[in-house]
Amino acid sequence: MLISTPSRNLRPGRLQPPALDALGQRSLNRRSLFKAAGAVGAAALIPLTACSSPASATGVTTIRFMQNKPEVIGYFNQVIKDFEALNPDIHVVQDSNEGNFVPSLVRNDPPDVMTRGYAQATADFTRKGIFADLSGLPAASTIDPKVQGLVNSWGQYNGNETSALPFSLAAAGVIYNRDLFAAHGVQVPTTWNEFVAACNTFKAAGIAPIYGTYKDHWTIQQGAFDYVAGGTLDVQGFFTAINAKGADISSASRESFTSNFGAVLPKILEVAGFAQPGAASKNYADGNAAFGKGQAAMYLQGPWALSELVKANKDIRLGMFPLPVSNNPEDAKVRVNVDMALLIARNTPRMEAAQRFVSYLLQPAVVNAFNEKNAAFSTLKDAAVTSNPQITGLAPFVKEGRYYQGAGTYFPPAVPVGNYLQAFVYGKDGNKFLADLDAEWRRVAERTAI
């Protein structure tokens, strides 16, 4: 299996956009990852050293909580304050520097409780046995099984452990300007033909149908690439198969990109072609400013962009819908990722305190308030439908489990899919694009084969 590096995933609300490597995923080099994985593999069954005693002389147990979003430090400070008031025998120290995670593994001193974006990177650590099995916590039974399935789809330690409990689910789609749609009599499209017709209506009116920011290649990757691929293919099934093929992959293989992604490419180009002139010279910041000012009808971005658009125009009325890529409305699906998952270090000597804190974080009042505030979706079974009008268009799809995890999240950073996508959108050579992906995948598989 290809091994990717630790990362940030899509971020909701006022959070920052993905960075340039693998959709904003904060990465470490392969040497650091393998060193950490090796250290954990050797130390997984060794108790943590006595330098971290379970409780102080006062009877108060201090636990370290590393969460993956510096932008929500204030929220968690209040949550911790409330928790400590109810649990005076536990003190929680918040750490928002996720870059300390791998060094802490090498030192055999990981944080007691963590939140991490959950995809290939975190799953690599799960498979090494770093995280405790949380299936026995009563709170585990409150998680929506469909959302828990997203976590489990990346693999489980010992094949059956529940190493992470989802806390926040982010959904991305097509952001649209409600006022422009209303002014031109355009309804939210539910089929591919309706989407193309909407684009042509705006184009005829002199309005850019889509604001493209192709100078930042990650915006092509998480946008047109992920949306079209996710709505067309069984993304998870494809990457399971190509991982199993390993270094034996070639363009002629049944499991290859060439054999599977050919049908996706024409629609990626068609979507890209509806962008404004000069999209190749515009970046994400340009797009936020321009779309906020009403210079386009649609924007292929995720929830992290919403607050930036409102910042550019406080009166803008926004909505979101999944990009339809077939002419059957029932085929429509939305791109999601587990933006925050809760984990406990397997060898923490403060397990009871850590479990109490995780159980508190998964109370509906905590989970639901966080997600409502940050334009994300609750991971709980019985959560109320979001009241945020910016994302209500995605809510039915999330509720029904009509979603996929983006194809871009399955690539290790060693495969520069964003660069190849950018070259494809500019040069329109689909055969070369797919052959390049097959060759890159094979090279990385050869280097990481163990």
Tell where the protein language model's regions lie, with residue ranges.
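C-terminal lobe and pocket-closing loops
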Residues: 124, 130, 302-315, 326-419, ...
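Hinge/lid segment of periplasmic solute-binding proteins
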Residues: 119-172, 196
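Conserved C-terminal helix/tail region of periplasmic/extracytoplasmic solute-binding proteins
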Residues: 2-3, 7, 13-24, 182, ...
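Glycine-centered hinge/linker elements that transmit conformational signals in sensory
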Residues: 201, 242-279
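N-terminal secretory signal peptides and thylakoid transit peptides that target proteins
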Residues: 18-40
